[in-house]
Structures are given as structure tokens and as C-alpha cells.
Amino acid sequence: MAEFPKVRMRRLRKANLRWMFREARLSPENLITPIFVDENIKEKKPIESMPDYFRIPLEMVDKEVEECLEKDLRSFILFGIPSYKDETGSSAYDQNGVIQKAVRRIKAEFPDAVIVTDVCLCEYTTHGHCGVVKDGEIVNDETLPIIGKTAVSHAESGADIVAPSGMMDGMVKAIREALDAAGFESTPIMSYSAKYASNFYSPFRDAAESGFKFGDRRGYQMDIHNAREAMREIELDVKEGADIIMVKPALPYLDIIRMVRERFDLPLAAYNVSGEYSMIKAAIKNGWLSEEAIYEVLISIKRAGADLIITYHSKEIAEKLQ
């Protein structure tokens, strides 16, 4: 291999050349915008722990989507704040539930918008856990039919992609079988395959009113110390029928994103989660970082190997990319 002075790495770093040789690129098409749909409010409600982010009333969700489409953001993931909760999360699969109504409302106005729906029970249960609880334990197998039923109700409402996030063993298989049996063989599953029991979720739990009433989620979400375990989780999801795999969170787990990219050929999503968002926004508001840090964060996730990024920064970064 040639050396200096024959090789001068700075030759390709001239201002009018740099863009030609960028190995990772970011565009609005790569971004998925989260929307918190709340059927209990009539006006947008600021989320205290997520600066500049809001809960959106059901009646205004189509307007929120329209604003994003004007910025070339075409893909959305919906999280619901329902009007009622119970022990088993039955409002998750209610055909008149908040997500079901939101999907129908959006699709009626914007049929080409890509709607991903979060399939989990934590927002719909009184205890705030992601599965059925018996004697203080989250019961895996009894949860599976409920999340299967929930996924079908989302597909019936018009969801383009369903995204199970509860980290129940066998959840992808249960959803794939339920969708196929209901005639939705072509509905893709984006699995939260490697979802870590992270401290970076706290603002989301405020936003979605999904905080747990007892214990924690370390019995079903992944241990933050483990990397090889993530490969096992993803391999199982692939075998069960996942079409898209995901790593969550993103920034503290760039090593996992890279490992997944090198081992699996499926489309890979990464979730730039609420704590990552709030951390960066707080630093910007205090003058400790410039807004350019947002782009650097997102391009680092892309560079690590993610095809898609779920991010609360989508609208502000899309404006800069236009």
C-alpha cells in the first residue's frame, strides 16, 4: 500500500469534493417519526421531560402527519394513550381503540403515509407492564394471544407494519401466525428484537403514561451487559418471521448495531430513544452543544449500520436536509 507523500488523505477533503465520498448518508426517507396519540385531550400537550415534543389529540393526528409529509417525512410509528386501562390491556385490541382510530383517520387522508404501530400492552394495562401479570410475575405465554389479537386489529385498521416491542419470547411467531390466519400475510413485522432494559426510556414513560407500578422490566428486556445474547434474540426473531429487526436504544448500543449489520441481512432499524433525545435537547438549550450535534448523532447511527432510524429529532433534521 502506498504511503505519504504519494497518498494524501486530505485530497478528497476539499469543500467541493467531500460530499461525493461520504460513506453514510441521511435522508428523510430513512427516518420514522414517533407520534403519541392521546384520546383524552383536545389540544397538543407538551411532554415535560421531552423538550419541544407533544402528545397529539386523536382529532389532530392527521394534521400532525400532514406537517411531517410537507418535510418529506413519510413514515410514522404510533403510540396510544387510551381512554381506559385494565389488568390485561384489552383496550390495545379494541377496534374503537386509540391506535385503531388513529390509523383509520390517517389512512383516510393520507393513504400513502407509512404507518407503523407499536404492539405492546404497557400503555394499556393498569400495572404498566408489557404482559399479563399473575402473582406478581409477567406471564409470557398467556400474553402471546393478546398481542397477536392486537396486531390483527392494527392491520384491520390499515397499519402498514406492526412492531412488537414487549420482548415476550415467541412474540414474532404468535403475531405472524395471527396475521396469516386473518388474511394479512403481506403485513410486515418490525420486531424490537434487541431491546435493552435501559435507563434511557424514562421520558417515554412520561409521554405514553406507561410507567410500571411495581418491579422493573429486566425480567423480559435484555441485560445491558450482554452483546452475544442480542444475536440469539435476533436469530430467533428471524426464524419466527420478522421482516425488519431493531436495536433499542441506539447511541449506547452502536456496537450492537454494527454486530447485527455484519451478521444479518434483514433491514435494520435503530431507535434513537427519548432519553437520547432529551439529553441532546437539554444540552442544546443550555448552550453546551450546537444543533449540529443532532445530525452527528443520527449519522453515527446510520454509519454503524442502521437502515432506518426512529427518532424524535425527525422534523428538525428534515428541515436541515431539505
Curated annotation (Swiss-Prot):
| Pathway named in the protein's UniProt entry | Porphyrin-containing compound metabolism; protoporphyrin-IX biosynthesis; coproporphyrinogen-III from 5-aminolevulinate: step 1/4
Catalyses which reaction? 2 5-aminolevulinate = porphobilinogen + 2 H2O + H(+)
Q: Please list which residues make up the signal peptide.
A: none
Q: GO BP, one example?
A: protoporphyrinogen IX biosynthetic process
CDD domains per the UniProt record, alphabetical? ALAD_PBGS
Binding site residues for Mg(2+): 233
Q: Which Gene3D superfamilies match?
A: Aldolase class I
Q: Where does 5-aminolevulinate 2 bind?
A: 274, 312
Its job: Catalyzes an early step in the biosynthesis of tetrapyrroles. Binds two molecules of 5-aminolevulinate per subunit, each at a distinct site, and catalyzes their condensation to form porphobilinogen.
**Similarity annotation:** Belongs to the ALAD family.
PANTHER family recorded: DELTA-AMINOLEVULINIC ACID DEHYDRATASE
Name listed for the protein in its UniProt record: Delta-aminolevulinic acid dehydratase
Taxonomic classification, please? Archaea, Methanobacteriati, Methanobacteriota, Archaeoglobi, Archaeoglobales
* Gene of this entry: hemB
